[in-house]
Amino acid sequence: MCAERLGQFMTLALVLATFDPARGTDATNPPEGPQDRSPQQKGRLSLQNTAEIQHCLVNAGDVGCGVFECFENNSSEIRGLHGICMTFLHNAGKFDAQGKSFIKDALKCKAHALRHRFGCISRKCPAIREMVFQLQRECYLKHDLCAAAQENTRVIVEMIHFKDLLLHEPYVDLVNLLLTCGEEVKEAITHSVQVQCEQNWGSLCSILSFCTSAIQRPPTAPPERQPQVDRTKLSRAHHGEAGHHLPEPSSRETGRGAKGERGSKSHPNAHARGRVGGLGAQGPSGSSEWEDEQSEYSDIRR
């Protein structure tokens, strides 16, 4: 449940980070088509920014974080790559040999991909963002981010700061990948981010935790209902038993039945009427049937 809770925080961070996506974008360039400018995808990298980034990429060295710094000040607000690079380099000494190898290879992979792909895509900000995040995922997975995280969990957790998740989308992408690296890594990151959230947001973070737990709590299973067929069978069986256990006739009904049997030798319907009278309720109708039976019996004797 903690992992899902962290997922909610990541979503909130993305929402906060995209409040003003069009700030600083080139407004002089018209859209290529009517469908190209959706409400949250109006941004386009200005020609000046494009030229500056391309020039920066050419002059940036292969070692260090120079390539990522080229994307820090741009009109598409693609930020965070340089911060991730610097964080990895500053903490490289805390990693084991496998972790150091991952940092070196992953950063080199990302820098190489940025150089080769930037000039081949559209100037639309969403396209540039997608390119950046896609190549970042590819490099992390290619050089086995999870293996490095599992062997250096404590260092990885120390590198993740709550404020960066609110400001930089590349951090969110990195954390989402780390959450898939096994239970130990996931639990450690979740606990760290939750503690930092409470330190920064206080009771608001607790409210979010309560809401997410309430939303994701499995519904209480209703009591098992007996199938309709079974209930029908039981109902029929109940009525059948009630039919077999009829009330015992009273002494008056017994005498009337005996007289009915004697009269049935000449009048076959008399016995049937006697039985119906025995099953019926006591009342005015019962006395009238008794009088009819007496008159019929008198006629038979005559």
From Swiss-Prot:
InterPro entries: Stanniocalcin
Region annotated Disordered, chain positions: 23-44, 217-302
Keyword Phosphoprotein: yes
Pfam families, per the entry: Stanniocalcin
Signal sequence annotation: 1-24
Glycosylation site positions: N73, N74
A GO-annotated cellular component: extracellular space
GO BP annotations listed: intracellular calcium ion homeostasis
Location(s), subcellular: Secreted
Keywords: Disulfide bond, Glycoprotein, Hormone, Phosphoprotein, Secreted, Signal
Modified-residue entries (Phosphothreonine), positions: T254
One Gene Ontology MF term: hormone activity
Superkingdom in the source lineage: Eukaryota
Record field: compositional bias (Basic and acidic residues): 227-264
Residues that bear Phosphoserine: S250, S251
Family statement drawn from the similarity comment of this UniProt entry: Belongs to the stanniocalcin family.
Functional description taken from the UniProt entry: Has an anti-hypocalcemic action on calcium and phosphate homeostasis.
Subunit comment: Homodimer; disulfide-linked.
Protein name: Stanniocalcin-2
Name of the encoding gene: STC2
